Amino acid sequence: MKQQKDASKPAHFFHQVIVIALVLFVSKIIESFMPIPMPGSVIGLVLLFVLLCTGAVKLGEVEKVGTTLTNNIGLLFVPAGISVVNSLGVISQAPFLIIGLIIVSTILLLICTGYVTQIIMKVTSRSKGDKVTKKIKIEEAQAHD
């Protein structure tokens, strides 16, 4: 019984930082071997998701640090904003092209999101409809008995 309490207890903050740092370290190693360029942080997110889904990492082992990072996400975007300001010279060379790319990519993103949402809604409504149909058939069979 005591082991169950210890297993469900959230890990200490430092332990959680180490777990996330190890995931990021492994993702950086994977990034160096990948044939296509992909940011290590994206690989790390996918890796952490897989580890959480498989149970290799428990939610309590990363939850507090994850929540802290999410709560301070605005502060984490400051370096990205500064790098954009430093790149203004590059942006000023082709501003209409960049604005056009932003508009086109936003429209494509909205279209793809709409289609995926429609597909998911159709699939979930079918599965719900199948469950309702089965339940009605069972109730009818019980009523005839």
Swiss-Prot record:
The chain crosses the membrane at residues 13-30, 40-62, 69-91, 95-117. It is a multi-pass membrane protein. It is found in: Cell membrane. Keywords: Cell membrane, Cytolysis, Membrane, Transmembrane, Transmembrane helix. One of its GO terms (cellular component) is plasma membrane. Pfam families: LrgA (PF03788). GO terms for biological process: cytolysis; killing of cells of another organism; programmed cell death. The keyword Cytoplasm does not apply. It comes from the Bacteria. HAMAP family: LrgA. Belongs to the CidA/LrgA family. LrgA subfamily. Inhibits the expression or activity of extracellular murein hydrolases by interacting, possibly with LrgB, with the holin-like proteins CidA and/or CidB. The LrgAB and CidAB proteins may affect the proton motive force of the membrane. May be involved in programmed cell death (PCD), possibly triggering PCD in response to antibiotics and environmental stresses. This is Antiholin-like protein LrgA. It comes from Staphylococcus aureus (strain MW2). The lineage of its organism: Bacteria, Bacillati, Bacillota, Bacilli, Bacillales. The gene is lrgA.
